[in-house]
Amino acid sequence: MAGQVVQYGRHRKRRNYARISEVLELPNLIEIQTKSYDWFLKEGLLEMFRDISPIEDFTGNLSLEFVDYRLGEPKYDLEESKNRDATYAAPLRVKVRLIIKETGEVKEQEVFMGDFPLMTDTGTFVINGAERVIVSQLVRSPSVYFNEKIDKNGRENYDATIIPNRGAWLEYETDAKDVVYVRIDRTRKLPLTVLLRALGFSNDQEIIDLLGDSEYLRNTLEKDGTENTEQALLEIYERLRPGEPPTVENAKSLLYSRFFDPKRYDLASVGRYKANKKLHLKHRLFNQRLAEPIVNSETGEIVAEEGTVLDRRKLDEIMEVLETNANSEVFELEGTVIDEPVEIQSIKVYVPNDEEGRTTTVIGNALPDSEVKCITPADIIASMSYFFNLLNGIGYTDDIDHLGNRRLRSVGELLQNQFRIGLSRMERVVRERMSIQDTDSITPQQLINIRPVIASIKEFFGSSQLSQFMDQANPLAELTHKRRLSALGPGGLTRERAQMEVRDVHYSHYGRMCPIETPEGPNIGLINSLSSYARVNEFGFIETPYRKVDLDTNSITDQIDYLTADEEDSYVVAQANSRLDENGRFLDDEVVCRFRGNNTVMAKEKMDYMDVSPKQVVSAATACIPFLENDDSNRALMGANMQRQAVPLMNTEAPFVGTGMEHVAARDSGAAITAKYRGRVEHVESKEILVRRLVEENGTEHEGELDRYPLAKFKRSNTGTCYNQRPIVSVGDVVEYNEILADGPSMELGEMALGRNVVVGFMTWDGYNYEDAVIMSERLVKDDVYTSIHIEEYESEARDTKLGPEEITRDIPNVSENALKNLDDRGIVYVGAEVKDGDILVGKVTPKGVTELTAEERLLHAIFGEKAREVRDTSLRVPHGAGGIVLDVKVFNREEGDDTLSPGVNQLVRVYIVQKRKIHVGDKMCGRHGNKGVISKIVPEEDMPYLPDGRPIDIMLNPLGVPSRMNIGQVLELHLGMAAKNLGIHVASPVFDGANDDDVWSTIEEAGMARDGKTVLYDGRTGEPFDNRISVGVMYMLKLAHMVDDKLHARSTGPYSLVTQQPLGGKAQFGGQRFGEMEVWALEAYGAAYTLQEILTYKSDDTVGRVKTYEAIVKGENISRPSVPESFRVLMKELQSLGLDVKVMDEQDNEIEMADVDDEDATERKVDLQQKDVPETQKETTD
């Protein structure tokens, strides 16, 4: 028997064909969300309050500090928040201290700063009752970047940019005359030496001594018109603030505020880390020949002689000295922006490949402390030095698409940035209030206005591009949405501007971002998914795990290191399927490995690391595709994306052929209920599970608290599918931490179950499976194999209007008693009623405008003091094409103290209608390999082809769909699935390490099937065998969310657009089918004049004619001639508005007055033309 049996969860065993043992458990797949939010609550918020404290007034007398904060208890729990359309949030209370320096008085107070949305255990937020996910954003990391570019003459040029987290950009570039320029904050360019002089290196010789002599520097000094620091400062001021009178003091404060003021310029910890890494000497001296010795500045000891070539070993030896103080110099600069001394490290090296033996100076920034979040003069000098070194061939340019230069902003950081915006707006208000209010009676509460803070948080959760309505179609869709990485959003790219390079797969994505799972269409490559083992480090860079190789023994150790993309560039990594002996040594002398972007073969002694698992390359969704290695990447992409669109079925079934990921994905998705502690199950019912904790103390186990786990029953998901949880544990079971207690939607026995295992034959049948169409047996309809449950929510609110309040009632004018049969005495439909489109769900009336009373009404009014009630029917009705059974009704009343109702609403009624949808012709189906199709025919069971034992098959697929698509995985799945069914087992074939040919064929033989996996099929209609043997097997097929019931649409009459009077378009507007210009050409070509005329008039915008036609049809009369279409009038008016005099003439050249035509038609046809001027954008017809 190939493979070994592995237990997945409590209830499922699978025969696993993997050959590589799992050395590392998969991490918690939604950790990227929860970890980031925890960081925000523990550190991010405090960091914000520290950054903004203290807020001082303009005189410096008052000072406001934010000391500490705490989160209170949420007003509503999670369930209640969803039911009430409220936000699941906790009150944020901040301890604020106000110091009055004149008197030394200190006032402390706790200030409420709004409700702060809380993250649920499953990584989502509940905002206004709806579950939302904050998607992580991929952005360019703050750092120093060097770029190579070719100018129009074909010469190599460089440019450099210092990009902060927030603040002014600093850019260097060269021109055709070899002069180096600097741009401050994207303004006009200045010679680079002007900025150096402004920093305090005032004369030419100082600059040459600092940066080393070079042709580029000489050219720049020639171009530079300034001679000392003061002139340079004035020159910069004139460039940045043209038109303002320059003074040295103003220039200093301007330069200070642009680069050295921590409130305005922020590299962030990640920017400091990247800048230190880039500008430090250790990476820049690699393989360079020294032109002067390296000296330990403290002891005076020479650690590397002149002429030494610094290879990796030598660099590692002197690293400690390099990192502390080798060749350091300190400059005391006067008359400049910053008074502090500037420390740098400078080492002369020989220019590579230079026959004259010229030298150049390499300057490092002496590693400022990680707390220094501003740029320092040392950084600017070191970056200039790097630029000149590049011109001499020392150093590297950066690849902007490398994941070492792109980082993730997860929930915590996105929230922090938004909170910072709110706090800085609040800071302005506080300053203003400090100067107005009386110092004696002032309190912190009076100074603080929390509105801007609340508004910025609300805005972020409610309308940011990165705050998305959770995709809740099935557990995999939830999981993938939480692990999504987007390059779009504020501060990111836009679809239109994103080049091919940004979207492309990059070698640094390996193990960090899935190369397969990304949307098709305009967002391809901009929205990605995190790989299965990847995690995010403190700086926001994605890391992937590798097994460490012991360099002495050349064996794989148990140590696992997580490496970022730029760390990995220094190492050689062997593949996960390299052959090892039992001691972890490589069996082959030559090993397939990766180094930077190259896949190559190297000697086993050169290996530094080895992959953890073959599936570390791909995301969770892609890892659910068995035989992924046999599919073409385009189809694998479709397979990964379509799994997310599978509709949860009524009867779920896990795949016979899985990958072993199904259990992990189901557990971490948040759709299942998992145990928070180890314990014993005490009570199980459909609505809740009770578990008694088992606590271990001093080696003995005793019972602890009782935990309640409520289950969701038949709730509506975000996508309108049924969200239902079922217990899978029994009383007395001992459950471990994080074990699944209850299945969610699309789950079976703790595994993801998106579709059903059905018997599939690859064959044609009367041409019904042309173009990927699917032919299906009626058994799948009868036995509810692909039946799904859908829940739709409808709501109606009674508001206060100018003419009086709306009323929910059963007493509706002009409605038959039959139409009210499903309503209770309140006028609301009862639970369990069966409703179809057009039926009333909630009876509601709205007061009409007051009309002039007749004499009789005035008399009645005088006698009874009340006129007849003037109301119009505004009831909530079932929309077209909908209907089903009323599942639940929720009523919210203002009188009963429901403060969650929005202003002006007195009552809110929500009605939930459930539909059971069987599978239909027109529904979309797919497998897991991107093999999708639409059902074209449902064939009676007795007519389906049947196997030699008499069993009819379930589905027929077109064999032509396989060769050109190159997704051979589906054929292997088909054979292995049949074998698994016959053997009564489930199998797991993990990606890139699954069942190979021999495994598949040996399992087929074990199951007693034919060696070629094919069989004779008999035609169900005639009983004759088909000519050739046919591949028949079991395939896992999914029903997708694109259902024909949602797409079918028909209209007789309906709403028209106000200006053109043409029917609206689209199902949502109950619109018509557009008859466009090409269709008109077709009718013209046929000469179908009358058909064309009625399409352009009655059926479109002949306002008079269409009313008349409807009338004629109802009365059974002949249809009269059409009148002028409205669009002709619109055209005339357009031309008149351009000042052109347009007249309509008859055959005798007499002018026709359009108004007369209207009136004539109207009087002749008894049509009221006044109804046209209804001031709404979309006007319903009254016909």
Swiss-Prot record:
PROSITE patterns: RNA_POL_BETA (PS01166). Residues 1149-1183 are annotated as: Disordered. The keyword Nuclease does not apply. It catalyses: RNA(n) + a ribonucleoside 5'-triphosphate = RNA(n+1) + diphosphate. The keyword Transferase applies. One of its GO terms (molecular function) is DNA binding. It comes from the Bacteria. Disulfide bonds: none annotated. Residues 1149-1162 have a biased composition (Acidic residues). Residues 1163-1183 have a biased composition (Basic and acidic residues). This is DNA-directed RNA polymerase subunit beta. The gene is rpoB.
